[in-house]
A protein has these predicted regions:
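Glycine-biased, small-residue-rich flexible motifs in mid-sequence functional cores and linkers
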Residues: 83-86, 96-97, 102, 118, ...
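Phosphate-binding/switch region of NTP-binding enzymes
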Residues: 166-233
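A short acidic, amphipathic alpha-helical/loop segment
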Residues: 72-76, 98, 123, 147-151, ...
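Detector for small/aliphatic-rich hydrophobic stretches
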Residues: 1-87, 101, 106, 197-200, ...
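Long, charge-dense
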Residues: 84-143
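Conserved RecA-like P-loop NTPase ATPase core
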Residues: 43, 60, 109, 136, ...
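A contiguous pocket-lining binding segment that forms or flanks enzyme active sites
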Residues: 128-172, 177
């Protein structure tokens, strides 16, 4: 069978008009799904669709936990806080003060802990497949590429904000995530390196100033754990509430 000849008009069409996975290398791609505003105009201007993509894997590689990643995500989490927000295997228990600063009510939070990597990945997949959560933040040291692909596929079936938070070294590993950012602490804010995005290469890191939680909550109560963790294998009952 002879392949159909490409029409002359196709040569001048926007790449996205030919296939949604295509874009010009000199331009940011159009968003293939709904995006959530980052709340940081300088960052949004550098992302396809002008925000965090939903229904897909987003890789955040951290120099170390606690460098400002939660403050970076605060506006987006507040935007989806009408639905459950899942913290899976966070390095520290979530604190009431931090949740208040994020605009998240403790009743909307599910804090999950798992004993093994397999349980972490299983729980993440169940959250994504349920379609009932506004955001999933999953902390993990090492994840095999095939496991990332499985989670990415599960994410595409819904509109959950899905962030995988891993060490900087993970930036050298392959990942199906269309957006990968490396985060490093800087005085007064955070430095963001665009490891991968659907658009032109950006070599210079982006600096974002971040305001401390305590700046907004000077009279907040003393930090305390927001709730007890849920075992990963006991997740199903939490998702149907």
């Amino acid at each position: 069978m002879i392949a159909p000849t490409m029409r002359r008009s196709d040569l001048h069409a926007e790449p996205e008009a030919l296939h949604p996975s295509l874009w010009r290398a000199s331009q940011l791609a159009r968003a293939g799904a709904r995006c959530i505003d980052t709340g940081h105009p300088a960052l949004s201007a550098q992302l396809p669709g002008g925000g965090w993509p939903t229904g897909t894997l987003v890789d955040l590689m951290l120099q170390q936990p606690g460098i400002g990643e939660m403050r970076l995500l605060r506006p987006a989490l507040a935007a989806v806080a009408s639905r459950r927000i899942v913290l899976l295997q966070p390095p520290h228990p979530p604190q009431a003060l931090a949740l208040a600063a994020l605009g998240v009510q403790p009743s909307q939070l599910i804090w999950l802990r798992a004993g093994t990597t397999a349980d972490v990945l299983w729980a993440a997949e169940q959250v994504l497949k349920s379609g009932s959560c506004g955001a999933l933040l999953c902390w993990q040291q090492q994840v095999r590429p095939e496991s990332l692909r499985r989670l990415h596929l599960a994410a595409q079936g819904g509109d959950t904000l899905f962030f995988m938070l891993r060490p900087l070294a993970a930036g050298h590993d392959t990942s199906p995530a269309p957006l990968r950012l490396a985060l490093r602490p800087q005085a007064g804010g955070i430095g963001i390196e665009f490891v991968k995005r659907r658009g032109p290469l950006r070599e210079a890191p982006l600096f974002l100033p971040l305001v401390s939680y305590l700046h907004h909550h000077r009279h907040a109560p003393v930090d305390r754990p927001a709730s007890a963790p849920v075992a990963a294998r006991g997740l199903q009952s939490q998702l149907v509430h």
